């Protein structure tokens, strides 16, 4: 009976170790595709760099755009206002030139957004070619910018400082005006 108890204990420990190793490899994999600081973005302060993978499979880092203004749009597939404003977002991105860049972010599994695979499959049916859609699977970027509703916009200046975070709808003219006023 003691022998049986010992064998049972060893089996349990082995199973727990395998589970932990599996969790560790999953976390390492997530770290490769997503590096986001939990630092809160504060107006007038430098924002933390992030690294996210886009729906297109490319890696995007905020630091790659140093010297350019960044229009960062957080949105969701279920948000009708977000969907209605995507054509304007696409047009703004198309006209960006060297002055600014447009990045959009979705957070699968957070705030009602569908799972990542479902989102990517759904997004394939849309035809927006001028802006990347970055995937924030942990929701950390969403959190760091204080996103409580969709859409939410963040404007980052050429030095990487947060100029403004604006929840709710902004039309094309308001977005372009904000970018222009950033200098």
Residue ranges and their predicted role:
Residues 49-70, 94:
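A short beta-strand-turn-helix
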Residues 119-156:
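Short, internal strand/loop/helix patches
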Residues 68-70, 75-78, 149:
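Short pre-active-site segment immediately N-terminal to redox-active cysteine/selenocysteine motifs
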Residues 158-183:
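Thiol-/selenol-based redox modules, centered on thioredoxin-like
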């Amino acid at each position: 009976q003691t022998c049986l108890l010992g064998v049972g204990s060893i089996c349990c420990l082995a199973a727990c170790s395998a589970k932990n190793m599996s969790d560790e490899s999953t976390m390492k994999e997530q770290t490769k595709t997503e590096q986001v600081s939990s630092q809160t973005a504060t107006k007038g302060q430098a924002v933390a760099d992030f690294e996210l993978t886009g729906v297109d499979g490319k890696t995007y880092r905020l630091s790659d755009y140093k010297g350019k203004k960044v229009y960062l749009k957080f949105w969701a597939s279920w948000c009708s206002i977000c969907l209605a404003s995507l054509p304007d977002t696409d047009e703004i991105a198309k006209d960006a030139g060297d002055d600014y860049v447009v990045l959009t972010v979705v957070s699968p599994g957070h705030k009602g957004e569908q799972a990542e695979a479902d989102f990517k499959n759904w997004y394939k049916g849309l035809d927006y070619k001028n802006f990347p859609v970055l995937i924030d699977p942990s929701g950390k970027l969403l959190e760091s910018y204080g996103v409580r509703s969709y859409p939410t916009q963040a404007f980052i200046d050429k030095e990487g400082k947060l100029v403004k975070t604006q929840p709710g709808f902004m039309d094309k003219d308001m977005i372009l005006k904000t970018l222009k006023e950033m200098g």
